[in-house]
Every structure is written in C-alpha cells, then in structure tokens.
C-alpha cells in the first residue's frame, strides 16, 4: 500500500490528523517497532517515547509521530517521511488493522462439534472442531467459537463475539455483544466459598451466574468465578490482561483495564475507568471508586475514593508511598545511628 494511501486512511481515523511530510511515496508493506523497522516499513514515535534517542538509527520508511518540533525537525534532517497526529498510538493501531487482515472463519458447524438438541445457534456462526454446546444455550449471530471450547447449559451469548480455543463458559453465564475471550480462560467457574466448621470446611454451593456486557476483552488463562447467589458482573468496555482472577460476586464498572496477575477477592466493587497494574490485589468486599489508578503489586485492603492514585502494601496515596519508600531505603543507616545513640 502506498504511503499516501495510508495517510488518507489515517485522515479518516480517530487519531486527529494534523499534517504529513512525504519525501518518497514508497509502498508500505509492513509495520515494526522504531528500532527494528527497515525499508518499506512504518513505525511510530510518541513524544515521551524512550526510543527518541534511537531515531537517528531507524531505517523506517515512514514514522507516525506527534506535533513535536524537535522530532519533526530530526525526521526532516534524516529524510524520513512522517505523519503527524495528536495520538500516534491510535494511528499506528489503525494502520496495523489495515496491513494485517484479521482471519475470518467461515460460517458453519464442524462435524466433530457436539451440540445439544435444545441449543439454538444463530446465523453466520463458526463452531469449530471439538466444540461442545450444552442444553438450552442460546447463541446469537456471527459468533466464532473456536477449537475445543465448551459452552455449558443455560448460557446466553449475543452477537459478534470471539471465543478462542479451549475456553470454558459455565452454566448461567451471559455474554453480550462484541466480546473477545482468549484461549484457556474460564468464565463462571465455582466461587471459592467454604465455611469453617469443627476444623473442617463445609462447601457453600455456588449457584449464581456471570454477566459480561458488550466490548469486554478477556486475556488468556483468566478465571471469572460465579457466586453462591446473584451474579459476578463486568460492565462494558473493560479489558483484562492474561492471568487475571475475578472472585465470586465481584462487580466491575465500565472501561476498566487490569494488567496481568491482578486478583480481586469476592464481593469487591470496582468503579468505572479503574486501572490496576500488574499483581494488584483487592480485598473482599472493598469498594474502589471511579478513575482510580493502582500501581504494580498494590494491596488494596480498604475502600478507595474516586480519582485516587495509590501505591504500596497496604495501599496509600502515591505521594505518601514514595516518601515512605525513600525512608525505607535509609532504615539500615537510621538503625545504625540509633544503636550508636543507645551506647552513649
């Protein structure tokens, strides 16, 4: 695809196109990172990107960047064509979607699939090899359910969803529209509910369900448990990385993003647009407000107000954590001084 055609594509997109400088209208065949790009490839560079220092070593034919005079001047000196937008990352995502076409699965049901006679399958669905679909399950239109996945009984799936290989969707789960569940994830498994009695554990039956709204994406090897009663709920637009654990009865708001190894204990309530970095843990029944950001390995043991940026274990405001960390580094020196004072 000619670079000028990619410029036209970006103009029509959501990155807020500003201008372009094309030194040679080459055919763009591929995309790559800034330090790995070669001739006939396109890359991107954000204003705060740590790869700025590697710009003079890049062999990219074109670079998408922000309206930064320093970067634009450097690109001109290097004779690298550039496309200037407000949000380079979004523009690059749009280019990737165009250059790398998504694999489309042909509608149809594979001969090895096992589908209960009471299940209902909508139009234009792809049901892959060794898929199981249980009794009274209803699946909407244009869904791709790939190899080895199991959809148990009384499940409701909307339209335009992709369920990747070897996923399990347990009974009493609802999945709305335009969702993606990546491989080996389990939706609606039994919640971790046991009652202590006489030095033993009595199992609490987990008879609830899971409801996942539209445009949710779930990474690989995630587990979303169902509660004893009621539902575990994930609102629209939320994104889960790989290896995320959502406990029974958890309620998660809209457009949240949870990185790998986040764990949320049963009954917690997470607001809208919450960002949890890697390995954040949320205690049971804790309420986390809207627009909260929690840094990596943060331990959230109490309710968090809207808009807070928190860090540490136990979680505290980020500024307090930074001060505490600074003091923590000095503890050996302070302890030594205290011992010296004790001897006086």
From Swiss-Prot:
Task: Supply one GO BP term.
Answer: lipid A biosynthetic process
What Enzyme Commission number(s) does the record list for this chain? Answer: 2.3.1.191
The membrane-spanning stretches of this chain are none
Q: Does the keyword Membrane apply?
A: no
- What reaction does this catalyse? a UDP-3-O-[(3R)-3-hydroxyacyl]-alpha-D-glucosamine + a (3R)-hydroxyacyl-[ACP] = a UDP-2-N,3-O-bis[(3R)-3-hydroxyacyl]-alpha-D-glucosamine + holo-[ACP] + H(+)
Q: Does the keyword Transport apply?
A: no
Q: Which InterPro entries match?
A: Hexapep, LpxD, Trimer_LpxA-like_sf, UDP_GlcNAc_AcTrfase_non-rep
Please state the pathway this protein functions in, per its UniProt record. Bacterial outer membrane biogenesis; LPS lipid A biosynthesis
Q: Name one GO molecular function term.
A: N-acyltransferase activity
- Name it: UDP-3-O-acylglucosamine N-acyltransferase
Q: Please name the source species.
A: Prochlorococcus marinus (strain MIT 9312)
């Amino acid at each position: 695809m000619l670079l000028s055609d990619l410029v036209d594509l970006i103009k029509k997109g959501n990155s807020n196109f500003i201008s372009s400088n094309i030194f040679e209208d080459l055919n763009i065949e591929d995309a790559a990172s800034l330090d790995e790009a070669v001739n006939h490839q396109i890359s991107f560079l954000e204003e705060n990107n740590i790869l700025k220092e590697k710009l003079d070593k890049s062999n990219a034919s074109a670079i998408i960047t922000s309206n930064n005079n320093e970067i634009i001047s450097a690109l001109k000196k290097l004779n690298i064509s550039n496309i200037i937008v407000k949000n380079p990352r979004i523009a690059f995502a749009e280019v990737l979607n165009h250059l790398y076409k998504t694999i489309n699965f042909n509608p149809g049901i594979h001969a090895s699939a096992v589908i209960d006679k009471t299940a209902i399958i909508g139009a234009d669905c792809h049901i892959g090899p060794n898929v199981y679909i249980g009794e009274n399950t209803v699946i909407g239109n244009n869904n791709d359910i790939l190899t080895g996945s199991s959809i148990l009984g009384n499940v409701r799936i909307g339209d335009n969803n992709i369920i990747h290989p070897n996923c399990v969707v347990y009974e009493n789960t609802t999945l709305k529209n335009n969702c993606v569940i990546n491989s080996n994830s389990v939706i609606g498994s039994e919640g971790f509910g046991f009652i202590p009695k006489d030095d033993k554990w009595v199992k609490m039956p987990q008879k609830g369900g899971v409801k996942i709204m539209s445009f949710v994406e779930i990474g690989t090897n995630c587990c979303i448990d169902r509660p004893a009663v009621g539902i575990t709920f994930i609102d629209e637009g939320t994104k889960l990385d790989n290896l995320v654990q959502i406990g029974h009865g958890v309620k998660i708001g809209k457009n949240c993003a949870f990185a790998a190894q986040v764990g949320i204990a049963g009954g917690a309530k997470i607001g809208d647009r919450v960002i949890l970095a890697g390995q954040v843990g949320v205690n049971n029944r804790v309420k986390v407000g809207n627009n909260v950001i929690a840094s990596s390995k943060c331990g959230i043991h109490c309710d968090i107000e809207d808009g807070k940026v928190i860090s540490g274990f136990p979680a505290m405001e980020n500024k307090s954590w930074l001060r505490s960390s600074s003091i923590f580094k000095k503890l050996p020196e302070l302890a030594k001084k205290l011992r010296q004072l004790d001897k006086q």
